[in-house]
């Protein structure tokens, strides 16, 4: 069976997108029983697959879309800001048209995506209304990080769990090691600079590991 994939990235966060409305051997994918978890693991693996941080399943029509996200390790994810923008670009490509506002239903609820600018045939600038940020309790196994109690830490939800830790030197932190200690959250480390009004951030994504975004 030949399934068409498109490969996208948002800020270096890479995703494969499958339009489940496509017809293969006379039947649309959405009507088939396909093990998408196994497909995500195989396709996202850089050794033998295309390599990506996750697999996005697209459904819907026109400016109304639905998104299902499966991480590279096969685990589900409720939401991704970069992922949803990649999904919308794939939807535009499938429809051969663009819409100024797109409604995307995710496992974290409805998200609104706005087309800011069409840069060229391969690039778009899209903004996402991510919804309210709400506080979360300290995640399970947080003590494994052995954080200094004076270090600034926030546990937050944007539909999926994030923990943000302020550090002095972002390059001195072994983020891969820390992320593997708390694999059920998205772990971000931040430090001031390089400009006075900027911060630098690195991310260890739940189910995906270190990403470029």
How would you name each of these model-derived features?
Residues 1-122, 163-213:
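A glycine-rich beta-to-alpha transition motif near the start of alpha/beta enzyme domains, typified by
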Residues 87, 132-134, 157-160:
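Contiguous hydrophobic segments
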Residues 106-109, 123-135:
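Membrane helix-loop-helix hairpins that form the core translocation module of multi-pass transporters
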Residues 127-129, 153-155, 200-202:
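Active-site-proximal beta-strand elements of phosphoester/diester hydrolases
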Residues 133, 137-145:
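A short, surface-exposed loop/turn module that caps and links secondary-structure elements
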Residues 142-174:
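Internal active-site segments that recognize and position negatively charged phosphoryl groups
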């Amino acid at each position: 069976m030949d399934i068409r994939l498109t490969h996208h990235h948002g800020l270096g966060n890479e995703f494969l997108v499958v339009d489940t409305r496509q017809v293969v051997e006379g039947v649309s994918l959405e009507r088939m029983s396909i093990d998408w978890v196994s497909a995500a693991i195989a396709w996202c693996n850089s050794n033998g697959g295309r390599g990506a941080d996750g697999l996005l399943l697209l459904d819907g029509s026109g400016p109304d879309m639905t998104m299902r996200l499966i991480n590279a390790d096969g685990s589900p994810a409720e939401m991704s800001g970069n992922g949803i923008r990649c999904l919308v670009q794939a939807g535009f490509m499938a429809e051969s048209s663009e819409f100024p506002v797109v409604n995307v239903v995710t496992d974290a609820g409805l998200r609104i995506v706005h087309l800011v600018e069409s840069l060229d045939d391969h690039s778009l600038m899209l903004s996402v209304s991510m919804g309210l940020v709400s506080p979360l309790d300290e995640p399970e196994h947080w003590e494994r990080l052995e954080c200094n109690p004076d270090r600034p830490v926030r546990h937050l939800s944007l539909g999926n769990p994030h923990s943000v830790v302020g550090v002095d030197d972002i390059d001195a932190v072994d983020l891969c090691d820390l992320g593997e200690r708390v694999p059920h959250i998205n772990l971000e480390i931040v430090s001031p600079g390089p400009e006075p009004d900027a911060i630098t951030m690195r991310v260890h994504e739940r189910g995906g590991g270190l990403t470029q975004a």
